[in-house]
Amino acid sequence: MSQEFVEDYSRTGSSDDEDSGAYDEWIPSFCSRFGHEYFCQVPTEFIEDDFNMTSLSQEVPHYRKALDLILDLEAMSDEEEDEDDVVEEDEVDQEMQSNDGHDEGKRRNKSPVVNKSIIEHAAEQLYGLIHARFILTKPGLQAMAEKFDHKEFGTCPRYYCNGMQLLPCGLSDTVGKHTVRLYCPSCQDLYLPQSSRFLCLEGAFWGTSFPGVFLKHFKELEEYVERKSKESYELKVFGFRINDEAVSGPRMKWLRQYPSTEEDWEEFAKCEFETPAV
């Protein structure tokens, strides 16, 4: 019985050591959180490229620590520090007892310790800004296209759009301005997420350019949207259409108007890139 107990204890002890040595990677853990289904996983190769990180150090506080946390360098350094602390614990105690005044001077020169929750918040902000840049690249567009095909961003609530898939976007590229919006390629309108778990997501983590780049990259989607019938709802009372000049008549109807003649299409093409001459 004693030998069996020793064998069982050795097995459990080895399994505990393996579990303690393993840790979850930060990026997959962040993207798998509840309410983060709109995010895609950014490869570490993209983050390690200094060109892709240009000017982000000026926008995110504690940039270096946040970047190390995203790349899982923080977890590795913590494990090394724990091992060093166990080995050198006795030596540090002896030095502190012998050199109290010298240690006080060292403590004053050391940088203040930052709370881990602050670093975690900075890492989330940094990853969101990196994510906004990554989804404009070819691999990022492909990753977002898979989510688009699976309708992970939802469908347009407008009846005449016939369940068109939506695209996430932001009203500003600056953090803290607006939450995420959903763009419909069919009616070209913006909507709030229907689920409350997405209402607090930062819009800058997808940026203002993503829907336009997405539609230009996937030409078949743009052509499909152009082939769809452009119908708009008309108010009627007992089958009679309400006059546009009536008090209860339709407003801002021009927002859903589309070119119908060749002249209208030429004017539309000019307005897309320049102001037409009056």
Curated annotation (Swiss-Prot):
Disordered as annotated region, ranges: 1-22, 78-111
The organism's place on the tree of life at top rank: Eukaryota
This protein's UniProt keywords: Acetylation, Phosphoprotein
Modification Phosphoserine, positions: S2
Modification type N-acetylserine: residues: S2
Keyword flag Phosphoprotein: yes
GO-annotated biological processes: DNA damage response; maturation of SSU-rRNA; nucleolar large rRNA transcription by RNA polymerase I; regulation of cell cycle; regulation of ribosomal protein gene transcription by RNA polymerase II; regulation of transcription by RNA polymerase I; regulation of transcription by RNA polymerase III; ribosomal small subunit assembly
Classification via Pfam families: CK_II_beta
GO cellular component, one term: small-subunit processome
PTM remark: Phosphorylated by alpha subunit.
Record's compositionally biased regions (Acidic residues): 78-94
Segments traversing the membrane: none
Molecular function via GO: protein kinase regulator activity; protein serine/threonine kinase inhibitor activity
InterPro entries: Casein_kin_II_reg-sub_N (IPR016149), Casein_kinase_II_beta-like (IPR035991), Casein_kinase_II_reg-sub (IPR000704)
Annotated signal peptide: none
Similarity field: Belongs to the casein kinase 2 subunit beta family.
Known role: Regulatory subunit of casein kinase II/CK2. As part of the kinase complex regulates the basal catalytic activity of the alpha subunit a constitutively active serine/threonine-protein kinase that phosphorylates a large number of substrates containing acidic residues C-terminal to the phosphorylated serine or threonine.
Extra facts: Present with 8120 molecules/cell in log phase SD medium.
Subunit architecture: Tetramer composed of an alpha subunit, an alpha' subunit, one beta subunit and one beta' subunit. Interacts with FACT subunits POB3 and SPT16. interacts with YTA7.
Protein name: Casein kinase II subunit beta
Organism listed in the record: Saccharomyces cerevisiae (strain ATCC 204508 / S288c) (Baker's yeast)
Gene name as annotated: CKB1
